[in-house]
Amino acid sequence: MDTFPSIFPPGGDSRLNPEPEFQSMLIDERVRCEHHKHNYQALKIEHKRLQEEYVKSQNELKRVLNEKQTNQEKFQLLLEELRGELVEKVKDMEAMKLQILTPQKLELVKAQLQQELEAPMRERFRTLDEEVERYRAEYNKLRYEHTFLKSEFEHQKEELTRISEEEKMKYKSEVARLEKDKEELHNQLLSVDPTRDSKRVEQLVREKTHLLQKLKSLEAEVAELRAEKENSGAQVENVQRIQVRQLAEMQATLRSLEAEKQSAKLQAERLEKELQSSNEQNTCLISKLHKADREISTLTSQVKELKHANKLEITDVKLEAARAKSELERERNKIQSELDGLQSDNEILKSTVEHHKVLLVEKDRELIRKVQAAKEEGYQKLVVLQDEKLELENRLSDLEKMKVEHDVWRQSEKDQCEEKLRASQAAEEAARRELQSIRLKLQQQIVNTEKAEKEKLENSELKQQISHLQIQVTSLTQSENDLLNSNQMLKDMVERLKQECRHLRSQAEKVQLEVEKTLEEKQIQWLEEKHKLHERITDREEKYNQAKEKLQRAATAQKKRKSLHENKLKRLQEKVEVLEAKKEELETENQVLNRQNVPFEEYTRLQKRLKDIQRRHNEFRSLILVPNMPPAASVNPANFQSSAIVPGVELSFPPHLQEEQHQRELSLLRKRLEELETTQRKQLEELGSPGE
């Protein structure tokens, strides 16, 4: 801005001359400003790019550090896993020790064997007792049902007898009353004049209707008695069915008892086989015990040899461990001094880093003034960062190599630990190999710690491994002591087992003798039960055959009686229908005669005709009521034809004769009913005796 006064002229005449110069200067300034602006923007973009690269490099450094930490954590996890595997294998050893037989375990095995042998026998006896109780309950139930049915049958029988007696008394009283009425009517007929016959006939017709109603009521009673008879027959059939069902149930129970007897025989045979197999198993176990005694003796001799060899090897290992310990202490001191130097270098590097940070801040301030210098310095820094990146990559590759070597070392250590657990004889040689491998690995780690930044943790791991090895050495000594104690315990156990085997042999012999005795007793009991069952079966079969024969006889007799009664009832029904037809004809003729006046001569002639008809009718009735007469002579159509010759005159006979005939028919019917009742009672008694 100081150049402007020198440009403008002092005079006023020269105003037009400086304007183009001023414009050219403005244009130049504008061009410079634009150039500076472009440069500033380019420098700004470059500065952003450099900052981004710086952030990326820091992120990569953090990532590398995180990966290193993760690798260290993985190594620690591997160590913990190996320790856990060692603990598990120690537990497995203890479990194997616990699996050795002890006297308590032997007692438990004995108790289990005894329970397994006694449980099925007890279960079988319990089931047999339950079955006996069940059969007993069924027998009591059947007996109770039989008594109940018998009592019901007797009660029904008594009711039938009572009802029949009441009916008899009623019929007898009615018969006596009817006979008295008949005598009175007969006397009245003899005393009455013939002129008053018409009125008397009307009265007799009324009485006849009344008697017909009584006859219908008596027929209804006869039908009721027939229905009662059918009911009694149905009850008898029900009783027969019940008896047949009970017999079938008894046969089923007998079959089930035979099946149970066979199953008991099979079970006895199976128990004998089990006893034989148990004896064979006892012999096998005794032979196995002898073999175990021999193996234990060989193992004791081997253990003694191993003890002697272990003592010699332990002394060698102790000497080598002392030497290795002194060497490790020397190496530890060297590593400690190197670590101190590395820590001092690390502090110097930290201070340089802080100084660089300060310089970076100052350079950021000077970037506005010195863009070109900043650009060059930026390029130099990029080169330095790339070099550092290459160094970091080299370190990462070295760390990966160390990781691979460490993994190999871990795998070898794991294999060595497994070999230690599997074979106690090679434990000392594995320890020597581990010490040599540890020395080599320590040397490799010392060489690698010159290139790494954080090797202090690895040294601590090495210290832990050394302490772990010392612990392993102490554990080996303890395991030797445990082996000595276990060998002594095994010897004691062998002696105890021998004594227990002898005791078990004696107990097994006693148990075998007891089982044989019990089997003999049970066989005797089973034979007695079998004999008793055979006797019961024979008795039941005899009773069943007798009852069956009685039932067959009763059934045949009942069928015959039933057929005879059915035939007789059919005949009686036919005759009753004929008589009803005759009665209807007589009623019609009687009505006709009532309308007409009959002279005395015709009356006498009709009386004679009536006597002839009564005689024929009595003959016909005797044929109907007497069952021994042939059915061919029961009906004479000529008589009916002759009776029908005089339709208007011959039915004017006196009514008292009709009443007498009716009374006779009723008396004959009562007799037949009484005979039927007696036959039914006899049949019921015959059916009741086989049921009892």
UniProtKB/Swiss-Prot annotation:
Q: Report the main location listed first in the record.
A: cytoplasm
State the GO CC annotations: centriole; centrosome; ciliary transition fiber; Golgi apparatus
Please list the GO biological process terms of this entry: cilium assembly; establishment of centrosome localization; protein localization to centrosome; vesicle docking
- Where in the sequence is Phosphoserine found? S689
Can you tell me which residues the record assigns to a coiled coil?
Answer: 32-625, 656-689
The subcellular localization recorded is: Cytoplasm, Cytoskeleton, Microtubule organizing center, Centrosome, Centriole
Keywords recorded for this protein, A-Z: Cilium biogenesis/degradation, Coiled coil, Cytoplasm, Cytoskeleton, Phosphoprotein
Give the protein family.
Belongs to the CEP83 family.
The cross-references to PANTHER family, in alphabetical order and at most eight, read:
CENTROSOMAL PROTEIN OF 83 KDA, NY-REN-58 ANTIGEN
Subunit note: Interacts with CEP164 and IFT20.
Report the protein's function. Answer: Component of the distal appendage region of the centriole involved in the initiation of primary cilium assembly. May collaborate with IFT20 in the trafficking of ciliary membrane proteins from the Golgi complex to the cilium during the initiation of primary cilium assembly.
Q: What is this protein called?
A: Centrosomal protein of 83 kDa
Provide the taxonomic classification: Eukaryota, Metazoa, Chordata, Craniata, Vertebrata
